[in-house]
Amino acid sequence: MFNNLKNKEQEELLPEHIGIIMDGNGRWAKQKGKPRIFGHKAGMDSLKDVAVHGARRGIKVMTVYAFSTENWTRPVDEVKFIMSLPIDFYSKYVPVLKEENIQIRMIGEREGLPKATLDSIDRAAQETSENDGMILNFAMNYGGRRDIILAIQELAKSGQDLSLLTEEELSKHLQTAVLSENLRDPDLIIRTSGEQRMSNFLTWQSAYSELYFAQTAWPDFDDKELDKAISAFQKRDRRYGGVK
């Protein structure tokens, strides 16, 4: 009886919105004597498994850092391969995601992304548009600082008096605001592969997120690792700068 109540209480403490910095693909591949692109391909398969498990756990939104504005500085061949991954991912896994009632969305600047990449994202979003389960949100060509700048520029163009700008008003113009009305900022942000930094991911939105740094490289991050991160979150005491 007590265990059932405890389990129910923990489920009620689920993070609604999880952000994931999928790190370690290249290092994982190097350890296996493989090229970096081998790690990116393995990471694609991990993403499907983690997304499905998150949806089944009852997570409402999962935002994954797929490609940052800084990633353009990587070798040309690697960038080209990464840009092909959405095409492969959606063609391979959209049927599974549809069956799991998962919605596909994207944030980030469309300008600069290859047409084939954008077409695959748009097609996946359209094919899952009638789903009402977890939102799987891909941050592509995304940077947190750039997100804030674009929001301010948009407000300035609309004639907004920026001297009266509030946090609430700015939040409404950030890219995550288009995902869902009244979308929560990330409750939990996970970074894999042992690195402990945010790397310009959801800079504004992560102000009060709980952070979880997993030692596991992204290609090895699975449903059990996600459960460990959620369990750690459930043990945190979130005070939002106050005192309890």
Curated annotation (Swiss-Prot):
Pfam families: Prenyltransf (PF01255). PROSITE patterns: UPP_SYNTHASE (PS01066). Keywords: Magnesium, Metal-binding, Transferase. CDD domains: Cis_IPPS (cd00475). GO terms for biological process: polyprenol biosynthetic process. One of its GO terms (molecular function) is ditrans,polycis-undecaprenyl-diphosphate synthase [(2E,6E)-farnesyl-diphosphate specific] activity. Its cofactor is Mg(2+). It comes from the Bacteria. Its EC number is 2.5.1.-. Substrate binds at residues 24-28, 36, 40, 68-70, 72, 74, 191, 197-199. Mg(2+) binds at residues 23, 210. Belongs to the UPP synthase family. NCBIfam families: PRK14830.1, uppS. This is Isoprenyl transferase. It comes from Lactococcus lactis subsp. lactis (strain IL1403) (Streptococcus lactis).
